[in-house]
């Protein structure tokens, strides 16, 4: 029989869409209230002064000011604060 049968389908070809996580405003940058500072899964960065934390752990500015990153405590937790201008 000179017929070519259908080839098997590949098991590859799937990948999830990137989630665009990470730091959006870096230390020293000026932010306005509501600006997103960090998008993250879990609290890699913790909210400090004038920073709010959303349902999905997104950190955002509560006031206008300058972004500041700090490491505090014996656990070495990273905190993000907004220093009012």
From Swiss-Prot:
Q: Where is this region: Disordered?
A: 1-23
Annotated Gene Ontology cellular component terms:
cytosolic large ribosomal subunit
Endpoints of the signal sequence: none
Q: Which GO terms describe its molecular function?
A: structural constituent of ribosome
Question: Pfam families of this UniProt entry?
Answer: Ribosomal_L27
Give an example GO biological process: translation
| UniProtKB keywords | Ribonucleoprotein, Ribosomal protein
Family named by the database record: Belongs to the bacterial ribosomal protein bL27 family.
This chain's protein is named Large ribosomal subunit protein bL27
